[in-house]
Amino acid sequence: MSVKFADNSDKILKAMEKAKHNALTAIGMTAETNAKRDPDMPVDTGYARNSITYAVAGYEAGTKSYQADRAKGNQPKKRGNYSGTMEGEKDEFVAIGSNVSYFPDIELGGQNRKAHHILKKAATEHTDQYKQLVKDAYENA
């Protein structure tokens, strides 16, 4: 009787890497949605809210471009975009954020402006949801 062993470690490692990327992407997408749906998010035209996106390290942002839901005054709807890739080793982390210049005032507060911590809450108040996304990604690898 003979026994043959097959080394499938490369396949397993690739599946685990893909699962990690899928988990980070799912967390980013969900965190983006959680931030945009936060009832504390102050909305005038929707420009800042619509700018919220996620990016997995080493990859482009989940949102390429965005625009306000409505114009302000006689001006056209504001538009913005993201280009480039998130810094860091591929699949090292996922981040959510905005490139709108006044978003730090929304997040952290500013002169005569209350802090809303939209991004912080999206990242920290849904940990059970994010754990489930990781579990699902690895179980489906």
What are these regions (language model features)?
Residues M1-A141:
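Short, Lys/Arg-rich flexible segments
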